[in-house]
Amino acid sequence: MKLQFVTSGLRTTTQDLGRPGHTHMGVPTGGALDRSAMRYANHLVGNALAAPVLEVTLSGPHLHCLEAGRVALVGSGFDLLLNGEPQPPLLPISVNPGDELIIKSSGNGCRAYLSVSGQWHAERWLGSASALRIGSHELLPGAVWTRGDVLELSLIHI
């Protein structure tokens, strides 16, 4: 599955369970702020519970679907629109090439998690694909999404 960012929202990042066990070296655990929501979003699309997700903060992205797949949004205060139509919360949604996804804030929440079906093609550091900022520098380029970026995943074969 492939999704292209038309807009990225305020701060949309790649997050997983972070980097536990490295704080003695000065590396914060990081990862998704709401791990339960992250795991549930992954469960809805059939991914491993610890798989990366998109963490949306305050305002969500507008995504153009380049390939078919499934997505699920978990988090209060956000609505998922598919081609302009509101989708039911907490359910997997099938998308097709050409579809438009918009994650819209209702103003009542801070974060939401969009899981995307498949195996992520993401750079990892200390076992994690989570975005990590040190000062003003992003440690994993590509973990913070911007306009024009393409998220690419492979099908998971069981």
Labelled PLM ranges:
Residues 1-156:
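Conserved "landmark" site that anchors the functional core of diverse proteins
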